[in-house]
Amino acid sequence: MASYFDEHDCEPSDPEQETRTNMLLELARSLFNRMDFEDLGLVVDWDHHLPPPAAKTVVENLPRTVIRGSQAELKCPVCLLEFEEEETAIEMPCHHLFHSSCILPWLSKTNSCPLCRYELPTDDDTYEEHRRDKARKQQQQHRLENLHGAMYT
């Protein structure tokens, strides 16, 4: 009579491997059970998700610019239509100009300029913390590169 393992074409499991797997599962369960459901939002990987919309107060306070003379030749980067003289355009902090009917729907979905990706503040505290962490890491990397560059000069 063939053994169970021969009959099912498998190998007996390694008890040590099984113990490690069970320990990892128990660790994951205990961590998950101690997490508050609000903390689960902190697990979001913002580098692979769309950023939240721009803060409503920031969007409302964006400067409105009246198009004058030479600016009338400029085009809205979203719809590619030229601005009319005396028309009011919204100016982003990066100084790009847009028709309000073009940029307002965009900013209601994401917080960045469609041209240069300049980011406006959001109402999402988790995302803002992610932005601050990302900026700190970039500053740290920059200081480290400068330190390495200055080491032998």
Swiss-Prot record:
Tissue distribution is: Widely expressed, with highest levels in liver and heart and lowest levels in brain and skeletal muscle. Expressed in platelets (at protein level).
Q: What is its EC number?
A: 2.3.2.27
Pathway per its UniProt entry is:
Protein modification; protein ubiquitination
Q: Iron-sulfur among the record's keywords?
A: no
Zinc finger (RING-type) locations? Answer: 76-117
The GO cellular component terms are: cytoplasm
Modification after translation is described as: Autoubiquitinated as part of the enzymatic reaction.
Q: Which InterPro entries does this one have? A: Znf_RING, Znf_RING/FYVE/PHD
The processes (GO biological process) annotated in the record are: protein autoubiquitination; protein ubiquitination
Q: Where is this region: Disordered?
A: 127-153
Q: Which residues carry this modification: Phosphothreonine?
A: T153
Any single GO molecular-function term of the entry would be: ubiquitin protein ligase activity
Top-level EC class: transferase
Catalytic activity as recorded in UniProt: S-ubiquitinyl-[E2 ubiquitin-conjugating enzyme]-L-cysteine + [acceptor protein]-L-lysine = [E2 ubiquitin-conjugating enzyme]-L-cysteine + N(6)-ubiquitinyl-[acceptor protein]-L-lysine
- What is annotated about its quaternary structure and interactions? Directly interacts with ITGA2B and, as a result, with integrin ITGA2B/ITGB3. There is no evidence that integrin ITGA2B/ITGB3 is an endogenous substrate for RNF181-directed ubiquitination.
Q: What does this protein do?
A: E3 ubiquitin-protein ligase which accepts ubiquitin from an E2 ubiquitin-conjugating enzyme in the form of a thioester and then directly transfers the ubiquitin to targeted substrates. Catalyzes monoubiquitination of 26S proteasome subunit PSMC2/RPT1.
Q: Family, per the entry?
A: Belongs to the RNF181 family.
Q: What protein name applies here?
A: E3 ubiquitin-protein ligase RNF181
Q: What is the lineage of its organism?
A: Eukaryota, Metazoa, Chordata, Craniata, Vertebrata
